[in-house]
């Protein structure tokens, strides 16, 4: 059975630990901080088998070098570090190009891992699907999506459309606890969305108890995430009103997404 555990890092990052019982070897996703990972490994008597990276940003990769040295010192083995080939990340020794290779089989994880090409937040951003779990870094957040630092709106919309087509029961393990702030924006865009209203209440209660709102699910995101709903008339009308656009012609999805992202950037 695959167990997935969150290690909290910095202000709002989640580093995900993947363990297939009964193995004591684990993988971690996007370890921006080595110290919290090492503390977790030691306290749970686990060995680090590998690292999965989604993109190059420091809060996702900053701990890789120290973790690699830790494994070399404690086991005399070379740590396997998987990451996007396009981003030339330090310490990655298994570069992945999902346009050429879309599946992985990792030691100690009894499951095929699907590698997805999801540019937008960064130029080479990738995501991993393991059983019913999606590890999407900073591409898809609960009720939101990542900023466009390197990619285009067209790329990000394509990436989000790809993720939205995953099975509804897919659990969404993004890398940040941004849910409440994203929900505030989503309700500004779509105030009459009953699913949004209900989830805002639930998420607020969860955070008040210091509980994580992650994982989300693809089904939930289809219902509440404005960036997955840019074809909905309620979203289109809200964008037109916000940007003072009286044109009766229906906006296409790319234009809606572009304007929605611009709106969120200054929200």
From Swiss-Prot:
It catalyses: an S-(2-hydroxyacyl)glutathione + H2O = a 2-hydroxy carboxylate + glutathione + H(+). Pfam families: HAGH_C, Lactamase_B. Zn(2+) 1 binds at residues 55, 57, 121, 138. SMART domains: Lactamase_B (SM00849). Binds 2 Zn(2+) ions per subunit. It is an enzyme of class 3 (hydrolase). The gene is gloB. Its EC number is 3.1.2.6. Its cofactor is Zn(2+). Disulfide bonds: none annotated. One of its GO terms (biological process) is methylglyoxal catabolic process to D-lactate via S-lactoyl-glutathione. This is Hydroxyacylglutathione hydrolase. Keywords: Hydrolase, Metal-binding, Zinc. GO terms for molecular function: hydroxyacylglutathione hydrolase activity; metal ion binding. Monomer. PANTHER family: HYDROXYACYLGLUTATHIONE HYDROLASE, HYDROXYACYLGLUTATHIONE HYDROLASE GLOB. Zn(2+) 2 binds at residues 59-60, 138, 176. Thiolesterase that catalyzes the hydrolysis of S-D-lactoyl-glutathione to form glutathione and D-lactic acid. Belongs to the metallo-beta-lactamase superfamily. Glyoxalase II family. Pathway: Secondary metabolite metabolism; methylglyoxal degradation; (R)-lactate from methylglyoxal: step 2/2. HAMAP family: Glyoxalase_2.
